[in-house]
Amino acid sequence: EQAENEKNVKIKQRLLTFVVVGAGFAGVETAGEINDFLHEAISYYHNIKRDDVQVTLIEAGTTILPGFNKNLSKYAHTRLEKNGIKILVQNVVTSFDGKNIDIKKLSDSSSESIIDSHTLIWTAGVTPVEIIQNSAFKLKNGKIIVNEFLEIPNYPGIFAIGDCSQLDSETNNKFPPTAQLAEAHAKLTAYNIKQIIENKEKKKFEYRWKGQSAVIGKRYGIAEAMGMKITGFWAWLLWRNYYLTKMPNIEKRIRVWLDWNIDLFSRIDISRYGFKRDT
């Protein structure tokens, strides 16, 4: 709404430029969803053209979605650019003052540029919460080191799971920050707590990778599952069906399924405040 009524070209440009930092799962899916939403919503705003809106994705690494097969990452890169998203790899954000985003190219430290934008979305990584940093537990890279039972060494019966934990450094094994892993951690920890209560033998954590998928725009995705590499509509459909199975009960699955089907055949739903302007 603000950009629709803005007369200053530079301010309007800032309002319609959206920058997402970090091209992992969260960054790519966020950029894709924002881009789709904006370009569909434009039809409601007569003073905004399609070319006025720009979504930029910034990644410090050499490729987006580095955890995927290279061909799948390349497909995602091409699809996002085809949808109008600008992708800058090997670039980092050095500062943001609410109006200007300063970025620097890693391959050339003298190469700096500025993106005019009011909106910066950060998905490039997280730091541990203060309670972990100030704890008495042994840390590595800001994460609590755990043993093969997900217990904290020297603190029997105390577990650390999910993004805040890392296997003992001697195993040279890190945990990927995914919901799939967090769910596996939670199930094993619940089981081991039960075993401790009953004075029975605990079970070691063994991570069984089930595959992965990412949405890269409306009705497009990439996926790796059962040794197969899938792209496009079928990968997107696989992603949706998998997440339906994660709904806690049949009622919620039906609600989500109906909502997704309505979304397939209807225009985007937006809410307008309808502010009155002073005349």
Predicted regions located by residue number:
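FAD-site-proximal beta/loop scaffold in flavoenzymes
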Residues: 1-7, 100, 113-184, 191
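A conserved short coil-to-beta-strand element within the FAD-binding core of flavoproteins
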Residues: 89-100
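C-terminal, flexible cofactor-proximal segment of oxidoreductases
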Residues: 181, 190-279
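N-terminal Rossmann-fold NAD(P) dinucleotide-binding loop
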Residues: 27-28
